[in-house]
Swiss-Prot record:
Alphabetized GO MF terms: chemorepellent activity; ephrin receptor binding; neurotrophin TRKB receptor binding
Domain of life of the source: Eukaryota
Glycosylation sites: N37, N162
GO cellular component, one term: external side of plasma membrane
Disruption phenotype: Mice display cataract an opacification of the lens.
Tissue specificity annotation: Expressed in myogenic progenitor cells.
Gene3D superfamilies for this protein: Cupredoxins - blue copper proteins
Name of this protein: Ephrin-A5
Signal peptide residue numbers: 1-20
Amino acid sequence: MLHVEMLTLLFLVLWMCVFSQDPGSKVVADRYAVYWNSSNPRFQRGDYHIDVCINDYLDVFCPHYEDSVPEDKTERYVLYMVNFDGYSACDHTSKGFKRWECNRPHSPNGPLKFSEKFQLFTPFSLGFEFRPGREYFYISSAIPDNGRRSCLKLKVFVRPTNSCMKTIGVHDRVFDVNDKVENSLEPADDTVHESAEPSRGENAAQTPRIPSRLLAILLFLLAMLLTL
């Protein structure tokens, strides 16, 4: 019975060590809704950008049409995450990777929605990790039948942690294109433009580390367990 109690205590200490290490954690997460279509006025201006905090969400809604709209009148997009150069030139071929595909304009369940969580760490080898104080870029391009190339692009700035203090709440806050909320924090001159690459090799370097004091307690409890 004593072994079970010690194992339970050991598990609780380990759980505290791991889950107390996320400096970007917060109680309330904001969700930013972006309607990805050419009729969105914020895309038409060419300067669409949002400011987010770690653990916020980006919800991308694809174009959706009634069944009566012909296929050749619908919009379809492939969305890419790119670096700053790819964003400026609206070119994903040199340094970018495919993120989502809006390919079901007549979906019976409504518009396709894709969500991005701006998290510091991801358990997936091809997932993307975000850093406070850096900019990230999304683009899409479509070539209509008339050959005219169109480009929609979005810039996302992840705010520094000290500017993301949240009050306690029950529900996520949702912002969409019609909200009259101006971004109060513009990127500083020294803002880092993040490279558009998944976090394959960075996971090992960025994995949360257990503090030395808690590690000592953990080893002490393990030693006690082994002597029983």
